[in-house]
């Protein structure tokens, strides 16, 4: 397709030059023809790269129009390549959000309550946290302290593993089936239309970062050997400590890493990467204000507002709305809340039901929520007034945005 368009472009330019050789009007015609054909080439490329989006989707049209504007050199909205930064939430934005809970929550439950090599060693605290997650899954019980407790339990339950061992553990967990779907494993829940968006951005010289509330190393392990190809330094999440094998509890200020030493998970939870913490980590680790933001909950509101607020460049914030009940674990009340917030804060809504031709990879069939619905509904209850002054409970439970 691109080769054919290139031939077409060359032929059109040749015709315009022959028709107007030596004349200023001919030169203008040539320039106009070139611009028109270049615009057509770009439009066709967008159609190809966003083929899983319905053509009448407003979010798709806005993204394409935006890309045409910011990549036109000399245009008023042109953005230099070094400033083309896009940030994405993970759970519910790029990947199946809950089934019956977040990936990192189900990973902890498996480690503490089911893993035959660890469950007998699990601490009482880890068991308490895992059972809270199970209770939330089955009964929808709210635990406002759960996000921090979960982070602490993950850190302690995997303490002593090397980073590579942790990644390998996650690879095995990814092979387990996703309970509400046929043909999909725990690691296969990527949203295909959003993967196309990332490829489209990369093709237009964007650097893409994942800014997740999920543990940084869990995110990296989940994306390892997956359809989403990003380097680890562009995958940012909640943090836990890392130590040297020979450090023996000594403070890092007093210990020098030795050649040939190994790094291990240190067992200490540091920070949950949600809300304002997302803005802070973007500033600290990227150092450039993003021009595109993609999220799905109020946990991503700060990141969205940071992207479009006081930005010297043209910027947009997109929010996914989980309004599809036929193809995935949709939640209509949550989707409507997000539509309302998008209208209030000038974010662009993405309808999973109406904007996408498909959600998951070929061969995946949604067979029902089973135990997923109570946890998912109770885990996130965005409300308009909570964007500016989020309630403590909502901040706690909106935990993997």
Predicted regions and their residues:
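C-terminal cap/substrate-recognition subdomain and adjoining C-terminal extension
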Residues: 35-50, 165-209, 213-401
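Alpha-helical substrate-recognition element adjacent to the catalytic core
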Residues: 38-251
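Sec-dependent signal peptide cleavage junction
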Residues: 18-36
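A generic helix-loop boundary/linker signal
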Residues: 3-4, 11, 53, 156, ...
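Disordered, low-complexity tails and leader-like regions
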Residues: 1, 27, 381-382
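Short glycine-rich loop/turn motifs that provide flexible caps or phosphate-binding loops at active sites
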Residues: 5, 19, 91, 212, ...
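Sec-dependent N-terminal signal peptides of Gram-positive bacterial secreted proteins and lipoproteins
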Residues: 2-24
């Amino acid at each position: 397709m691109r080769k054919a368009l290139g031939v077409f472009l060359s032929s059109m330019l040749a015709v315009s030059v022959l028709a107007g050789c030596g004349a200023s009007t001919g030169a203008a015609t040539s320039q106009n023809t070139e611009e028109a054909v270049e615009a057509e080439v770009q439009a066709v490329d967008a159609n190809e790269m966003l083929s899983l989006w319905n053509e009448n989707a407003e979010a798709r049209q806005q993204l394409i129009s935006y890309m045409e504007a910011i990549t036109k050199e000399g245009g008023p909205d042109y953005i230099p390549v070094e400033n083309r930064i896009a940030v994405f939430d993970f759970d519910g934005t790029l990947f199946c959000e809950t089934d019956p809970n977040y990936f990192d929550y189900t990973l902890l439950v498996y480690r503490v309550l089911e893993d035959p090599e660890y469950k007998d060693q699990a601490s009482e605290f880890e068991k308490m946290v895992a059972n809270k997650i199970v209770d939330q899954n089955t009964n929808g019980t709210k635990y406002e302290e759960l996000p921090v407790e979960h982070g602490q339990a993950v850190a302690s339950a995997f303490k002593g593993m090397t980073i590579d061992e942790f990644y390998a553990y996650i690879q095995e967990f990814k092979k387990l089936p996703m309970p509400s779907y046929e043909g999909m494993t725990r690691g296969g829940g990527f949203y295909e239309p959003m993967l196309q968006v990332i490829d489209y951005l990369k093709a237009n010289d964007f650097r893409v970062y994942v800014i997740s509330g999920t543990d940084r190393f869990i995110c990296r392990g989940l994306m390892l050997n997956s359809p989403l190809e990003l380097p680890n330094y562009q995958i940012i999440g909640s943090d836990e400590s890392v130590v040297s094998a020979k450090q023996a509890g000594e403070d890092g200020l007093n210990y020098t890493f030795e050649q040939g030493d190994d790094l291990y998970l240190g067992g200490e939870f540091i920070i949950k990467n949600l809300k304002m913490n997302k803005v802070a980590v973007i500033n600290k680790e990227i150092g450039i204000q993003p021009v595109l933001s993609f999220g799905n909950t109020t946990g991503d509101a700060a990141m969205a507002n940071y992207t479009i607020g006081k930005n010297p460049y043209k910027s947009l914030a997109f929010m996914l709305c989980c309004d599809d009940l036929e193809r995935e674990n949709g939640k209509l009340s949550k989707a409507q809340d997000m539509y309302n917030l998008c209208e209030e804060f000038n974010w662009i809504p993405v309808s999973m039901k109406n904007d996408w031709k498909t959600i998951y990879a070929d061969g995946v069939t949604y067979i029902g929520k089973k135990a997923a619905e109570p946890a998912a509904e109770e885990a996130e209850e965005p409300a308009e007034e909570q964007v500016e002054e989020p309630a403590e409970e909502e901040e706690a439970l909106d935990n993997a945005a």
